[in-house]
Amino acid sequence: MGKYKCKSVGIIGCGIQGVCIGLQLIKKGIPVTIFDRYDLLSSEFQSASYGNAGHFSPYAVLQFNRTDILYDVPKMLFSSYGPLALKWNYAPKMISWFLHHLKNCNKKSMLHTAKYMHQILSLSNDAYEEIFKEIDTTNLVEKKGIIYVWTKQNLKSRKLEIKVRNDLGIEQKLLTQREVLELEPNLKPVFDAGVVYEGAMHARNPHGILQAIFKLF
């Protein structure tokens, strides 16, 4: 069987994954067409990489199959300030997915996911840095790390995250209340502790980064 030669590639969606994959393919001499309902260079662009938090988070290895998430779901659903929303008329269609999700909410699956997420994410910042060398990231990217803070009420959940990341060798620094306030003096002294991930980056303008990368095509 002869070696397959790719003549061209079509990519659906010009979010951060789409444009980064497209750029790498173009560098290999493969013509690329990206399909999206919006023009990336227009002000009407509304893809997944528009208006999000914009964190480059190589530490984010724990996903939603963590063992303690089920205890938080009811509170998140019924709180008007919660991060989770559900269209109840769509709920019956989600039963199969939800049962599969429940099956994977166990320690073994959680650690399996975290292990392989770490293998991918540990390469992500270096991969982005290669691209950032080719664009002007002034006012687009901040390299200040990220701080998570919590109260004693949330301590059990945070201990789980810290242990899993520590076991995987992820660089993190635990903070006392005093150290949290030294780093973020505008916070009220209601948080008991925190952790800082100094290798994390933040996109000040995710849409601007997308446009800058796309202009390399």
Predicted features by range, described:
Residues 24-28, 134, 216:
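Active-site catalytic microenvironments for nucleophilic, acid-base chemistry
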Residues 2-3:
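Glycine-rich helix-loop-beta junction characteristic of Rossmann-like nucleotide cofactor-binding loops
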Residues 6-34:
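N-terminal Rossmann-like FAD-binding beta1-loop-alpha1 element of flavoenzymes
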